[in-house]
UniProtKB/Swiss-Prot annotation:
The primary product of this enzyme is 4,2',4',6'-tetrahydroxychalcone (also termed naringenin-chalcone or chalcone) which can under specific conditions spontaneously isomerize into naringenin. Pathway: Secondary metabolite biosynthesis; flavonoid biosynthesis. Its EC number is 2.3.1.74. The gene is CHS6. This is Chalcone synthase 6. The active site is at C164. Belongs to the thiolase-like superfamily. Chalcone/stilbene synthases family. GO terms for biological process: flavonoid biosynthetic process; polyketide biosynthetic process. It comes from Trifolium subterraneum.
């Protein structure tokens, strides 16, 4: 007779969850940040709001963003004028777009990740899909399963409406799935499309304008599994430890509400201040067991909610400017892509580490941290171990 303990042991993987491949995708439409205020105020018929446009121009100038990618083109917006008003009923039009585009963009990223992984897609056992862009049944996880031709008994997990911290959440869930299911190969997809949040400007809702200055579209996909197959699967990062916490006294700091007018975005408190005030505690909890207290000795992947968050974290921890280079580069080239951002930064870091001849995927360092920040205010922490190049 086999004991429950023996069954349990046989079900578990031996090694830590490992990122085995990364793929990214963006819509074809590239938007230059320098000229975006002119386009935005013209397409929303708001050119008469000159003071507001000047404020928006300053927001864009200070954003540290050079370009973004957006599904919404001038043609699409002209065909859907309700999206260009501030609070016009427009959810049907938005849903019609994102229900199709979110899985489609996710597929594009997933195909790249599967190709790099080098294994047949029939070996995918689990799928985690995350988006803050629209809600539907069956969900984007189901649609992606069909688009990719995955097996019908792939175990699916759909995460809707989590916001900007969710790039950390999907890694936390993927780690648990990979380590607790021997032989599991988890396809993780984050796909975000701003068609759900785009709206015209308002004098009375400046935090909405912040979102219009920062958000971009993108999808990222990973393959995660434990015990990589030698010579076939090539590890990129190992996931060692994860945590999620709600920052104290932060209720209402970041809110998003799905209404007839789409997803409205609200910043009600000093978000950079809340993050920087709580970052030290999160780092101590994560790295004290590793006897690491010098945070310049680790590599950094932080969700770039905006430049002010990165600036305050750097200042609080006395980080060297190069620590946030990969994070700032992704913010500059793509804007804030919500949950997909940290996965883009993982990809950027491993590529640049190889190009620069460094000895590990983590900028030549062994240990690193990935942070997600978002509604709640919720902080996701993932401790990563790099792999020798």
């Amino acid at each position: 007779m086999v004991s429950v303990a023996e069954i349990r042991k046989a079900q578990r993987a031996e090694g830590p969850a490992t990122i085995l491949a990364i793929g990214t995708a963006n819509p074809a439409n590239k938007v230059e940040q320098a000229t975006y205020p002119d386009f935005y105020f013209k397409i929303t018929n708001s050119e008469h709001k000159t003071e507001l446009k000047e404020k928006f121009q300053r927001m864009c100038d200070k954003s540290m963003i050079k370009s973004r990618y957006m599904y919404l083109t001038e043609e699409i917006l002209k065909e859907n004028p309700s999206l260009c008003e501030y609070m016009a009923p427009s959810l049907d039009a938005r849903q019609d777009m994102v229900v199709v585009e979110v899985p489609r963009l996710g597929k594009e990223a997933a195909v790249k990740a599967i190709k790099e992984w080098g294994q047949p897609k029939s070996k995918i056992t689990h799928l985690i899909f995350c988006t803050t862009s629209g809600v539907d049944m069956p969900g984007a996880d189901y649609q992606l399963t069909k688009l990719l031709g995955l097996r019908p008994y792939v175990k699916r997990y759909m995460m809707y409406q989590q916001g900007c911290f969710a790039g950390g959440t999907v890694l936390r869930l993927a780690k648990d799935l990979a380590e607790n299911n021997k032989g599991a190969r988890v396809l993780v997809v984050c796909s975000e499309v701003t068609a759900v949040t785009f709206r015209g400007p308002s004098d009375t809702h400046l935090d909405s304008l912040v979102g219009q200055a920062l958000f971009g579209d993108g999808a990222a996909a990973l393959i995660v599994g434990s015990d990589p197959v030698p010579e076939i699967e090539k590890p990129i990062f190992e996931m060692v430890w994860t945590a999620q916490t709600i920052a104290p006294d932060s209720e209402g700091a970041i809110d998003g509400h799905l209404r007839e007018a789409g997803l409205t975005f609200h910043l009600l408190k000093d978000v950079p201040g809340i993050v920087s005030k709580n970052i030290d505690k999160a780092l101590v909890e994560a790295f004290q067991p590793l006897n690491i207290s010098d945070y310049n000795s680790i590599f950094w992947i932080a969700h770039p909610g905006g430049p002010a968050i990165l600036d305050q974290v750097e200042q609080k921890l006395a980080l060297k400017p190069e620590k946030m280079k990969a994070t700032r580069d992704v913010l500059s080239e793509y804007g804030n892509m919500s949950s997909a951002c940290v996965l883009f930064i993982l990809d950027e870091m491993r590529k640049k580490s190889a190009q620069n001849g460094l000895k590990t995927t983590g900028e030549g360092l062994d240990w690193g941290v990935l942070f997600g920040f978002g509604p709640g205010l919720t902080i996701e922490t993932v401790v990563l171990h790099s792999v020798a190049i």
